[in-house]
């Protein structure tokens, strides 16, 4: 049996997946299997042509299913996997050659760990290209449930290797969640007692797209709210982390209102933008938002020009 199962979900990624697969096959650590999951991709013909050079390898498995989203695709890979560990790689990302070797070394150093993640270099069509993930989304201190809830520690899926049994015991990825589905799983794993650790070695390359899920603020915060409310129900009111979850729900509601306000402002729907901004101000008490609120009522066109493409918080 392989020690590691590398799971690569594929949906509309024929252009990028050869580089992702090549980065797996170039690993210095070789005791792995590769599981590619075609998640009902509309570019299946091109996808299968792209992966054809790799299909005849005994360590490579290709699964095809109807579209179930990233959670359903990763779950199919996990359930097919034979490795003690699962490593997740998005099909448009890549790993450095020592990725698996260095990640697994952390498990050898501390056998109580259930998940290890590292840093990555950002690339693609984004203002963040050239920076590292931990430059923009830091992890600070121990990876506790509280640190995950408050986003003090942030786990990127492409940079994570986990014990397969810990993932299965937590209930796998939730197929009903198509954004922040990884965040949801990490929270559930931590809540059940799984131990996480990170290191800052830059071992992955993450490709950013302007039309990616993370680029849509409204949908991202909507998904965050779904995840936090799910965790609130899971933990119950008596859990020591319950107040933190409640605070994060209020914060995410305010962030969602703020994103909606910006969208409505740019669409010229000024009264609705002012109403959404007022909702955000019930959490955020900044002077800048207070001035923006006054401006939206007195001179909305001017505010629109001033805040086009800028964060108002």
Task: Outline where the language-model segments fall.
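Nucleotide-sugar donor-binding/catalytic module of glycosyltransferases
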Residues: 1-222
